[in-house]
Amino acid sequence: MFKIQLLTRYRSICLFSLAAMILPMAATAAAEARRPNVLLIYTDDQGSIDVNCYGAKDLITPNMDALAASGVKFTQFYSAAPVCSPSRAALMTGRYPQRAGLSHNASSARGGTGMPTQQVTMAEMLKAAGYATAHIGKWHMGYVDEQMPRAQGFDYTFGHMGGCIDNYSHFFYWQGPNRHDLWRQGKEVWHDGEFFPDLMVAEASAFIQQHRDEPWFIYWPINTPHYP
């Protein structure tokens, strides 16, 4: 009888120990499963009155309207700044532009400084959480290596570093001198004649396919409807 009781107790201890090991593993697996992919679409120089779902009558925005219909539509929301660079710095850091260190538009010339590297971006936070991270599109938060996307938490980057480009030549045409501005992973690339938003779609699709077995974050700041 004593041996049976001892064996029963031993089995109970083993089962408890096994459960103690399995439950945290299951909780971790569940947490892993709950990490959603994140696609952050950021349009350029577009106001709320430039979308049908907010009352616009002089243009057609079916895809944006579909996103609004299937998601959440804010009726009271304010951008942190009315111009490009500070609003992007605020979005990336969750801070007021002044606290993020970029309260004005960064220079669109190579060597122009922008948001300080010490600022912590959402890309850095998501990367630390195990996400594959990509910037695809417009940057405009600094045109020096230590302030460009790969130094701000992005594993992969494709796009233009300055404020705007022509969609086909990918040249910057604003107050001169005209200059080419298209980069992939910190290296200048040429896709003359190809429509930039289409290139963005192709780059995002390839990144998603490459990282289909892990959580990913794509910051997709399209350069439209901004000039030119």
Mark where each language-model region is.
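Formylglycine-dependent sulfatase
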Residues: 2, 11, 16, 20-22, ...
